[in-house]
């Protein structure tokens, strides 16, 4: 490869393992080692056989991007594994700030006199890797293991030798999706909804669609019940059981949960998934996994002893059937939050003027947010007598050090990510300061994704990513500053993310008496470990809090898994 190429590639050819009736894929890494914006376009000699995602794009200076080449499933093996197909990459220098959507075929036309660099790749068929056959301890090499799986995914019918565990057997199978755990366990608590989370992992190179259904649809529901798991990624599914009015006899349950999955076309989304895709009658074979539903005894937390009461006395607190937090639970939330937001100290600015201690710092971009979502949040906090800082309090034109002081004086920061957020270097500089305070244990940061797909945002896709790349180009002479921005974004994105819809908040805004309950839910998320300690909940116990009312037309589910809290907001 010559050193003056606009783009360099990590492969010199495209290799596909031949597996009949399965799509194959190969990823290419495109690296731009120049100081120019470089646009590219990919095309193949057989477009019906191969597709490239993305087929056009722009690689920023001194950066790289990944391209996935997908081959359609073969119905029969090619003779001698020979392939004459090729993949062509064309690339050229474009104007700074050019976006992916602005790349057109005309830009690469030689007839129009455009200088274009070309790279041609051969497509090669190779034999698929052969996994090693597992040999159980105590068996002769090559002998048949006594274990068998009669019902895929049914752990109770698998005999496992001493050296091969259930998880190992599942991992070594050729299933499209690996589901963890291997059964659905619900702790039995009368008059309470309970939930169980499942992790679906796709270790193939294909897009895999799934559909979930139960043998008792009135008793259980699954969120999401359909979806698409991208290649080499995973997703989480929540199974919820309706409240039981009486304990089942002998804790026995015959219900099952069925997952159907199949390979679909690249770029298929969840909204494209239909029941017909899994219909056997229509000739669409799907892989099926059945999970048993099991009832288990809930863990018994230690009995809390209130001051001034006898040990073992019955607690007064209870959770009402509608799922709202009980009076005792709300009191507990207040006991955690009040120390954070009471007894506010004051500070003095550079001109000797006494200012209130700002306890919540709101980091956002754009007047459209100030007049809608941010306005709601500020009102909700002020109703709770919490001091809030937004830039409407400060004089415009103040330097960043002044804003940094406001962050240092705050206990909680709310970072509201919108499409326009990454237009502002000030927002990102504030975020860097928030990250520093967070790492020192002085600040709790709550990220909110405002009308954004959280996953796309974390991958810097769409307008959010385009704006960031434009800002990187504008400040390309300050690489250390850019690196701090990216580190701050990644750090904050690893926290909980709430997905916001302004229409819902407008409804709440008309009835501000309901906002304090919602506010407590938002702020308490990052203190959940403290609640667990107070209530005796363990990390293996799934705690479900449902908030429902006529005003709020969606449920908020909160449950910790390995010290993480996941929030699902949906109609």
UniProtKB/Swiss-Prot annotation:
It is an enzyme of class 3 (hydrolase). Keywords: Hydrolase, NAD, Repeat. Residues 143-153, 311-322 have a biased composition (Polar residues). GO terms for biological process: signal transduction. The active site is at residue 430. Residues 132-154, 297-322 are annotated as: Disordered. Belongs to the VAMP-associated protein (VAP) (TC 9.B.17) family. This is Vesicle-associated protein 1-4. It comes from Arabidopsis thaliana. The gene is PVA14.
């Amino acid at each position: 490869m010559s050193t003056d190429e606009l783009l360099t590639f990590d492969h010199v050819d495209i290799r596909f393992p031949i597996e009949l009736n399965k799509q194959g894929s190969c990823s290419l890494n495109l690296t731009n080692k120049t100081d120019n914006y470089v646009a590219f376009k990919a095309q193949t000699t057989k477009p019906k056989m191969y597709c490239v995602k993305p087929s056009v794009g722009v690689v920023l200076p001194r950066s790289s991007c990944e391209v996935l080449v997908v081959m359609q499933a073969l119905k029969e093996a090619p003779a001698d594994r020979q392939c004459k197909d090729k993949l062509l990459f064309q690339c050229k220098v474009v104007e700074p700030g050019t976006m992916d959507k602005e790349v057109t075929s005309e830009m690469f036309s030689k007839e129009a006199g455009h200088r274009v660099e070309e790279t041609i790749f051969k497509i090669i068929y190779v034999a698929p890797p052969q996994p090693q056959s597992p040999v159980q301890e105590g068996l002769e090499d090559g002998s048949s293991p006594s274990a068998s799986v009669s019902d895929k995914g049914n752990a109770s019918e698998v005999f496992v030798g001493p050296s091969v565990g259930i998880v190992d057997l599942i991992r070594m199978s050729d299933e499209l999706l690996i589901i963890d755990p291997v059964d659905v366990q619900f702790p039995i608590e009368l008059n309470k909804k309970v939930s169980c989370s499942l992790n679906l992992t796709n270790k193939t190179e294909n897009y895999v669609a799934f559909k979930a259904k139960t043998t008792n649809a009135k008793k259980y529901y699954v969120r999401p019940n359909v979806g698409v798991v991208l290649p080499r990624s995973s997703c989480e599914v929540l199974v919820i059981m309706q409240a039981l009015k009486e304990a089942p006899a002998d804790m026995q349950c015959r219900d099952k949960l069925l997952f159907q999955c199949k390979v679909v076309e690249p770029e298929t989304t969840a909204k494209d998934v239909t029941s017909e895709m899994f219909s056997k009658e229509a000739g669409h074979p799907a892989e099926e996994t059945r999970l048993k539903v099991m009832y288990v005894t809930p863990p018994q937390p230690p009995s809390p002893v209130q001051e001034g009461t006898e040990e073992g006395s019955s607690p007064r607190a209870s959770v009402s059937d509608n799922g709202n937090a009980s009076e005792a639970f709300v009191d507990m939330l207040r006991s955690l939050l009040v120390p954070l937001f009471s007894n506010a100290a004051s500070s003095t600015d550079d001109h000797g003027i006494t200012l209130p201690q700002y306890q919540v710092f709101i980091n956002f971009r754009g007047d459209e947010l100030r007049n809608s979502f941010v306005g709601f949040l500020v009102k909700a906090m002020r109703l709770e007598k919490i001091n809030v800082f937004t830039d409407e309090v400060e004089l415009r034109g103040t330097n960043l050090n002044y804003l940094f002081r406001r962050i240092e004086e705050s206990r909680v920061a709310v970072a509201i990510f919108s499409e326009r957020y990454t237009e502002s270097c000030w927002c990102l500089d504030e975020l860097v300061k928030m990250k520093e305070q967070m790492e020192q244990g002085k600040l709790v940061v709550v990220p909110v994704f405002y009308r954004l797909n959280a996953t796309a945002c974390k991958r810097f896709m769409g307008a959010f990513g385009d704006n960031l790349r434009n800002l990187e180009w504008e400040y390309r002479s300050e690489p250390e500053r850019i690196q701090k921005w990216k580190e701050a974004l990644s750090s904050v994105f690893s926290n909980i993310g709430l997905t916001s819809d302004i229409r819902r908040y407008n409804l709440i805004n008309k009835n501000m008496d309901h906002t304090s309950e919602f506010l407590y839910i938002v702020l308490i998320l990052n203190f959940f470990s403290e609640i667990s300690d107070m209530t005796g909940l363990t990390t293996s116990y799934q705690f479900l809090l449902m908030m429902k009312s006529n005003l709020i037309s969606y449920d908020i589910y909160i449950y910790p898994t390995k010290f993480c809290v996941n929030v699902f907001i949906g109609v």
